[in-house]
A protein has these predicted regions:
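Membrane-cytosol interface segments of multi-pass membrane proteins
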Residues: 1-179, 187-191, 239-247
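Alpha-helical transmembrane segments of integral membrane proteins
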Residues: 4, 8-11, 196-199, 225
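Transmembrane alpha-helices and membrane-interface helical segments
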Residues: 66-69, 150, 200-215
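Hydrophobic, small-residue-rich membrane helices and short re-entrant helix-turn-helix hairpins
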Residues: 75-81, 210-221
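Juxtamembrane membrane-interface segments at transmembrane alpha-helix termini
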Residues: 90-95, 207-217, 233
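Alpha-helical transmembrane segments of multi-pass integral membrane proteins
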Residues: 109-122, 190-211, 224, 233
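Transmembrane helix-loop junctions in multi-pass membrane proteins
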Residues: 182-187, 212-215
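Alpha-helical transmembrane segments and terminal signal-anchor/GPI-anchor hydrophobic tails
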Residues: 217-249
Length: 249
């Protein structure tokens, strides 16, 4: 059965992502590829700082939950085929067919071509493609985590998944330092969006813990404590789950 609250979390987070990237082009930090500040006092930067720590993490949590729901009805082979055709193939083709154009404009705006006049054309094309990677990094990581998930399922035989159904509010609160620690691991040095540690943790927590209805029910009862404790995905999951907020959306 399709879970409406998961769809609501997803589309609202996507809206935040779009807003974030629109405002990011005018951030006051002066990051390469952006246009730059519009005014002396950049009030809109507050929105960037407010949502950046958690909104992509939340999407990976939801993706992990969705993976579990899919695997409840399909085999691992069907899951891998679906994820490969829907994630890996489009992200690879799109990177070199379309997104090099975005990379070109990013590098043009940031003045990168001025220092790369001696770079061979084929190498420059690859650099432009990865500079314009845009949202493709998300689905690339999602495919990697999906493949790892199948390996985990083969070894664990759902024993860990069944154990995680017992997670109560104190256990959920203890996930805060887990997420913080994961954020320090497996971060790529150049293309910084590839943060395997924190996003992988979010994906597997979504699969193992937050896909349980029993856990979400406990989370609903303790949502105020969660909100006061930290801004981790479980808080937002609870907030989005409240019937008074989302019913009928």
């Amino acid at each position: 059965m399709r879970k409406t609250y998961v769809d609501n979390i997803r589309w609202m987070t996507v809206v935040l992502v779009v807003m974030y990237h629109a405002l990011y082009m005018f951030n006051s930090v002066g990051i390469g590829g952006a246009i730059g500040p519009l005014m002396p006092v950049q009030v809109q930067d507050a929105f960037l700082y407010a949502v950046y720590p958690w909104f992509m993490l939340l999407l990976f949590v939801v993706s992990g939950m969705s993976a579990r729901f899919y695997l409840n009805q399909h085999s691992g082979r069907e899951f891998l085929k679906s994820r490969t055709t829907k994630l890996l193939v489009p992200s690879t083709i799109g990177l070199f067919v379309f997104f090099w154009i975005a990379g070109y404009y990013n590098m043009r705006i940031g003045g990168a071509f001025e220092s790369m006049s001696a770079v061979p054309g084929p190498v420059l094309f690859v650099i432009m493609a990865f500079s314009g990677i845009g949202p493709l990094w998300y689905i690339q990581l999602l495919w990697v985590f999906s493949v790892l998930l199948l390996a985990v399922r083969r070894v664990g035989k759902d024993r860990l998944y069944r154990l995680c159904e017992k997670a109560n509010l104190p256990v959920l609160l203890c996930l805060t330092p887990v997420i913080w620690g994961a954020a320090q691991l497996l971060n790529t040095p150049v293309i910084v969006v590839y943060r395997f540690g924190i996003y992988g943790a979010g994906f597997f927590l979504g699969y193992l813990i937050f896909s349980h209805d029993a856990v979400m029910d406990r989370l609903e009862k303790g949502w105020l404590v969660d909100c006061q404790a930290s801004a981790t995905p479980k808080n937002t999951s609870k907030g989005e789950r409240q019937p008074s907020l989302l019913r009928g959306l």
